Regions:
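Charged alpha-helical initiation segments
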Residues: 1-42
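Short linear sequence motifs
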Residues: 7-9, 13, 48, 73-76
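Generic detector of ordered secondary-structure context
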Residues: 15, 43-44, 108-111
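Amphipathic alpha-helices that form helix-helix packing interfaces
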Residues: 23-26, 48-55, 112-119
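Short, structured coil/loop segments at alpha-helix boundaries
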Residues: 33, 50, 99-103
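Short, hydrophobic, well-ordered secondary-structure elements
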Residues: 38-61
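Flexible secondary-structure boundary motifs
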Residues: 57-129
Length: 129
C-alpha cells in the first residue's frame, strides 16, 4: 500500500503576472506565425487589459487594504465606479495625477478598455453595402 503524502503551500499568487505571460506568449506566437495572427493579437490585447486591471487590484490592495476588502462594492458606485474609478483611485492613493487620456502611452489604456467593452458586451453587427 502506498504512503499518502499531504503537501501544503503558503504564499501569494500574482494573477497580473500570469495574465501578462499570456500577453507575451500570444505576442510571440503572432510573430512566429503572422498568417492568422489577428486572433493572437486580439487575445494579447484582451489579456493586456485584464493584466492591467489585476495589477491595479494588486497595487490598490497594497495601498488601501481595508478599501480593497470590499472592492466590488466600493467600485460599484460613484464617484469611483468601474474601471475608470478604480484607476483614478489608485492614482489618487499613490499621490499621482491622472495623465491626459488622449496622449500615449496612457491613451492605450483607454483604447484597450474600449476593445474589452466591445467584445465583452458584443452585439450582432449588421453590415449593409
Amino acid at each position: 500500500m502506498a504512503t499518502r503524502v499531504v503537501t501544503s503551500v503558503e504564499g501569494e499568487r500574482f494573477v497580473h503576472k500570469e495574465l501578462w505571460r499570456v500577453v507575451l506568449r500570444q505576442g510571440e506566437h503572432a510573430k512566429q506565425a503572422p498568417r492568422g495572427s489577428f486572433y493572437d493579437d486580439l487575445v494579447a490585447m484582451m489579456f493586456c487589459f485584464h493584466a492591467l486591471e489585476a495589477y491595479l487590484n494588486y497595487v490598490g490592495e497594497k495601498l488601501a487594504p481595508d478599501l480593497w476588502k470590499d472592492e466590488r462594492e466600493y467600485f460599484s458606485r460613484q464617484p469611483y465606479r468601474g474601471f475608470d474609478g478604480k484607476i483614478r483611485k489608485v492614482l489618487e492613493l499613490a499621490g499621482l495625477s491622472e495623465p491626459p487620456r488622449n496622449q500615449r502611452p496612457y491613451s492605450s489604456v483607454w483604447t484597450l478598455k474600449k476593445l474589452r467593452d466591445l467584445l465583452a458586451h458584443g452585439k450582432v453587427e449588421v453590415i449593409d453595402t
